[in-house]
Amino acid sequence: MISSDVIRGYNDTMILFLLQHNDSYGYELSKQIKLLSEEKYVIKETTLYSAFTRLEKNGYISSYYGEETNGKRRTYYHLTPEGLNYYHDKCREWNITKEVIDKFITVSN
């Protein structure tokens, strides 16, 4: 399991990555993160919804209500063009970060 402290700065990146493909809602996005990380990272609900609020406030995503199911309407999130640009910036930042950290990480058998 990955510590949430280690990955905190990249929750937004993971969400934006997933929203490139389809609009989605919170529970589905959390399941996709768990699945793609091979269950090494499980995003907490509070972390996820804090990220949605931050991303929407910054214009990186927009939200809308979907059809009502079981008495409740889901909130769907959509990636904006600004969000796609931000995602690409974060990917470049990650590659630089990884390059630097790799210089300090050694793996011994």
Question: Each PLM stretch: what is its role?
Answer:
Residues 56-73:
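Beta-hairpin "wing" of winged helix-turn-helix
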Residues 48-49, 55:
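Basic amphipathic alpha-helical segments that dock to polyanions
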Residues 85-109:
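Amphipathic alpha-helical dimerization/coiled-coil segments
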Residues 3-47:
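N-terminal helix-turn-helix DNA-binding core of bacterial DNA-binding proteins
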Residues 1-5, 65-66:
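Short beta-strand/turn micro-motifs at beta-sheet edges
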Residues 4-5, 60, 108-109:
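Short, contiguous hydrophobic alpha-helices characteristic of membrane insertion segments
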Residues 69-91:
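Basic, amphipathic "hinge/linker" alpha-helix immediately C-terminal to the N-terminal HTH DNA-binding motif
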Residues 17, 31, 50, 88, ...:
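A cross-family signal for key residues in well-ordered alpha-helices
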